UniProtKB/Swiss-Prot annotation:
The gene is IBL1. It comes from Arabidopsis thaliana. Residues 110-160 form the bHLH domain. Plants over-expressing IBL1 are dwarf with round-shaped, dark-green leaves and short petioles. Disruption phenotype: No visible phenotype. This is Transcription factor IBH1-like 1. Keywords: Brassinosteroid signaling pathway, DNA-binding, Gibberellin signaling pathway, Growth regulation, Nucleus, Transcription, Transcription regulation.
Length: 180
């Protein structure tokens, strides 16, 4: 799924608003601080496109709200910023390591046929790749449902593609201006 031009336009508007909010504080800062401000405003703009309807957008809003609460409140002013910032994400459930180790030992003791071994390898591979997705998508580590994780990942990819398209068009426009 490709991002629509209206998504690109809305992202650009929200990103510009975030950069304008940061503008007074950016002028006398280091390159690292400017980079951080650009990334922070882009993340908030991307999350505000989804208006907190997805887990990854709420996770980004929560993360950026701790870094720069003023920016988040300004950029989310039209979509109930207080409820999104204060909305708690579900807590991750944690297993006891001893129990997990004990159950793994019991499983190893049982003999497996070749097909069972292949199925177990495939399960481990899927689990490893799913964990990789959980680490990439904001808030992914809190999602226990794999189908929801895939839906959120696809939505996050579309939003990242929107961000890349807008940034690429800005760079192209700047390069065209320099060539003149």
């Amino acid at each position: 799924m490709q991002p629509t031009s209206s998504m690109n336009e809305e992202f650009l508007k929200k990103w510009q608003m975030g950069l304008q909010i940061f503008r007074p504080s950016i002028d006398n800062t280091s390159v690292h601080e400017r980079k951080k401000a650009i990334k922070l405003s882009a993340d908030v703009a991307m999350a505000s496109l989804r208006k907190g309807t997805t887990c990854w957008s709420r996770a980004l809003i929560e993360k950026t709200a701790t870094e720069d609460n003023f920016l988040v409140r300004q950029m989310l002013s039209g979509i109930k910023a207080e409820t999104l910032i204060n909305k708690k994400l579900p807590k991750k459930t944690v297993c006891h390591r001893k129990i997990v180790r004990r159950s793994k030992k019991i499983l190893r003791r049982k003999s497996k046929s070749a097909s069972e071994e292949a199925a177990a390898k495939a399960k481990r591979l899927v689990k490893r790749r799913t964990q990789g997705l959980r680490n990439v998508v904001p808030g992914g580590e809190l999602m226990s449902n794999d189908v929801l994780l895939l839906q959120e990942t696809l939505d996050y990819i579309v939003s990242l593609q929107t961000q890349v398209n807008v940034m690429r068009s800005i760079v192209d426009a700047a390069e065209a201006e320099i060539e003149r």
